[in-house]
């Protein structure tokens, strides 16, 4: 019961924060696991405070971004509050019902943590605090490892996986963290939007001066008029793509920023329920790190 009361109190506090009370902070308690989420949310509130004073952003873009972030915070918080109330309902008798509520609360908390992570990444990229450290890595092996980490989620959604990766080493000078971030963001994006189509594909090709990574899904796709803006951090689809399927909308902007830092290119082509493919081309040998245009 103490944890339930704490959840409700903290959820209300975060709602005050996203309405503009940036002085709000959450206090730790004896629940160690829960404290990890509290720490992340406090960091998020501080980051929102910093976002409000970043001079390099236009006022319109800044307000739009903060509006999107506020909405993305409120959505899982509303669910958390609702299910916490349900846990307190004296008519909820069965252990199964309680476990289902706890599972949903956990999933919504994970959504919050993902949003927080994206905001931190974007802030670090804006401040040029992420250094690209080049080293010869086997891009194919790192891709295989990324795929393995997503197999449980693919199985959960009943998605078929098509993989085309060279058997031999595919060495390229890339930043390990940045490359893995690109892989994870694009695979996660394909699962999120492609699960209705039940298919996901991953392809890697070694060319003379570059490696070419393609990750595709057979989901509803992206309208042609929206593709030019799909990598903008403040952009939301007219068809509420991000709102319908979840996600902050920042993942693709972060992916493009890492691709740009590698001196690479990213593109997308989309045919609804056939193939929506994101293709990343990274140079095998990197020149000096590239500054990201803000």
What are these regions (language model features)?
Residues 133-148:
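A conserved beta-strand-to-alpha-helix junction within the catalytic ATP-binding
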Residues 190-191:
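Short helix-loop "hinge" at the ATP-lid/N-box region of the Bergerat-fold HATPase_c
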Residues 217:
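Acidic ATP/Mg2+-coordinating residue in the GHKL
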Residues 197-209:
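Short beta-strand/loop element within the Bergerat-fold HATPase_c
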Residues 133-137, 155, 160-170:
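Conserved catalytic submotifs in the C-terminal HATPase_c
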Residues 222-234:
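Short conserved segment of the HATPase_c
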């Amino acid at each position: 019961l103490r944890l339930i009361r704490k959840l409700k109190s903290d959820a209300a506090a975060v709602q005050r924060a996203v309405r503009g009370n940036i002085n709000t902070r959450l206090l730790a308690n004896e629940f160690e696991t829960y404290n990890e989420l509290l720490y992340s949310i406090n960091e998020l509130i501080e980051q929102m405070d910093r976002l409000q004073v970043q001079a390099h952003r236009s006022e319109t873009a800044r307000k739009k971004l903060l509006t999107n972030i506020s909405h993305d915070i409120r959505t899982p918080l509303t669910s958390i509050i609702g299910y916490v109330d349900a846990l307190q309902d004296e008519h909820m008798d069965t252990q199964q019902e309680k476990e289902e509520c706890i599972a949903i609360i956990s999933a919504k908390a994970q959504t919050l943590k993902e949003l927080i992570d994206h905001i931190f990444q974007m802030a670090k990229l804006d401040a040029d605090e992420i250094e690209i450290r080049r080293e010869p890595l086997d891009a194919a092996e790192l891709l295989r490892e990324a795929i393995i980490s997503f197999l449980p989620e693919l199985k959960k959604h009943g998605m078929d996986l098509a993989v085309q990766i060279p058997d031999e080493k595919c060495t390229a000078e890339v930043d390990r963290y940045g490359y893995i971030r690109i892989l994870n963001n694009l695979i996660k994006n394909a699962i999120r939007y492609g699960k209705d189509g039940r298919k996901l594909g991953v392809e890697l090709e070694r060319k003379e001066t570059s490696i070419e990574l393609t990750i595709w899904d057979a989901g509803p796709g992206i309208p042609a008029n929206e593709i030019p803006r799909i990598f903008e951090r403040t952009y939301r689809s007219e068809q509420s793509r991000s709102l319908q399927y979840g996600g902050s909308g920042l993942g693709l902007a972060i992916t493009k920023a890492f691709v740009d830092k590698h001196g690479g290119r990213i593109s997308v082509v989309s045919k609804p329920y056939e193939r929506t493919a994101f293709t990343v081309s990274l140079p095998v040998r990197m020149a000096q790190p590239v500054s990201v245009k803000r």
